[in-house]
Regions:
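Extended, histidine- and acidic-residue-enriched regions that form the cofactor-binding/catalytic faces
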Residues: 1-58, 62-204
């Protein structure tokens, strides 16, 4: 397991309009980075995994919406390096079984299961009067429970196992990848910029 990353794509492309709609015209205080920074970072993380000996990579994103851009990076990387890279957001793992959301029953239940100390359900009503805005909170947030979160996460783990089995592994002997070796993949990603889900200027 690689260290998790708390930064993600936001404030650009469709995210910008959505953010204004669900949060309002306030400082959203997000851990956002420009899309090219996140995507390029993923590319070089994939390089690091291969050089460390991994022959398959599962990329799991807790931020739904921009996974198409992460898959684009994975696709271009796989054209250079023969290892499977599977990219999914957490709602995609359980699509058709559990409906995803943003800061609602789906997401809060998962957090209640794994880190209940980070959730204060008494603060749900703040969305109606807090100066920080509406928090993009889903209306069903009050329905969140740790038990529901356990069901979601166990189903996600099962699906990750299935995807990993389906993906298989790459060849054991691969040459060391330099930074320059993967630059062609980044050039290809940039050439497809207008197809990025997060394409657009950084707001603010």
């Amino acid at each position: 397991m690689a260290p998790s990353q708390g930064y993600h794509i936001h404030e650009t492309g469709f995210h910008g309009d959505w953010l204004e709609e669900v949060v309002g015209e306030v400082n959203p205080r997000l851990a956002a980075l420009p899309p090219d920074v996140v995507m390029r970072s993923l590319l070089f993380q994939l390089r690091a995994y291969v050089n460390a000996g991994f022959r398959a990579v599962m990329v799991l994103s807790g931020q739904n919406g921009a996974q198409g851009d992460l898959r684009l990076v994975a696709d271009e990387f796989m054209k250079l390096v023969p290892i499977p890279v599977v990219v999914r957001s957490d709602p995609e793992l359980v699509r058709g079984t559990f409906p995803g959301d943003h800061a609602g029953k789906f997401e809060l239940s998962q957090l209640l299961y794994i880190r209940p100390d980070l959730v204060d359900m008494t603060r749900l009503d703040r969305v109606s009067h807090d100066p920080l805005g509406r928090f993009a909170q889903n209306p069903d947030a009050h329905e969140a429970t740790a038990e529901y979160g356990k069901q979601v996460i166990e189903a996600q783990i099962d699906r990750v196992r299935e995807l990993a089995d389906q993906a298989g592994t790459g060849p054991p002997d691969l040459p060391f990848l330099s930074f320059d070796d993967v630059e062609p993949a980044w050039a290809a990603v940039q050439d497809r910029r207008q197809s990025w889900v997060s394409y657009g200027s950084v707001s603010g």
